[in-house]
Amino acid sequence: MPNRISSIALSSLIIAGVTGTPATSQQAPSSKFVITKGKDTVGIELFSRDTATLWSEIHLATGLRWQITANLRADSSVDHIEATRLTRQGVSTGVSVHFGDTLVSATIMAPGGSEQAEVTTRGKAAPFLAISFALVEQLVQASHLGNGESAKWTVARLGAGDTATLTISRIHPDSALVSTTDVELRLALSKQGEILGGRYVGQEWMFERRKVR
């Protein structure tokens, strides 16, 4: 079962929303993931990455949009993330999360100011958003798995507003399985550990990596 982040659940702020404009700044995207269901395009994630930062912007067909900036450590894990969720109606919600060795600290931006939430963790912790395959790719690369190996993470689920245990299994040299509460992703990987595409099981979404022209 997922654990709520303190008494200040991120999900309550995501539902309530904050009116405003996303403050996340990004560099020009170099790649994208196209998400489809049958012949329909469900969404697009534009992203870019250097050694220190990951930038991502997600546009869904429903009108929902996410903007993400993650600061990366030398081992490819995430040290800090800023995420903004913007609805079709222009309602914006912001969250900032720091990932320490044993503590995840979140700051939630609300109209009357900011609130703090913390959760103690054992082992590695990271952000997770099921529709951000750039973040999923970051998790795969930070796990440093060989063929047949697996790793467990405590993830702060940005969409659900809780924490949960996530497992990454390197099934074959060119594939991996990511599973957590109510989410299962089957990934096709390159030799460099990049996600080439895959399937969101249950939703029956397919996603494919493409270059931005």
Go through each PLM region and give its residues:
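Bacterial N-terminal signal peptides that target proteins for export
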Residues: M1-L10
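Solvent-exposed helix/loop surface patches that form functional interfaces
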Residues: A28, D40-T41, T87-T180, Q192, ...
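Short, small/polar residue-rich loop motifs at catalytic or cofactor-binding pockets
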Residues: A28-P29, R65-W66, T181-V183
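N-terminal mature ectodomain segment of secretory-pathway/periplasmic proteins
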Residues: S31, T36-I108, G193
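Short, basic/aromatic-enriched C-terminal tail that caps enzymatic domains
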Residues: E204-K211
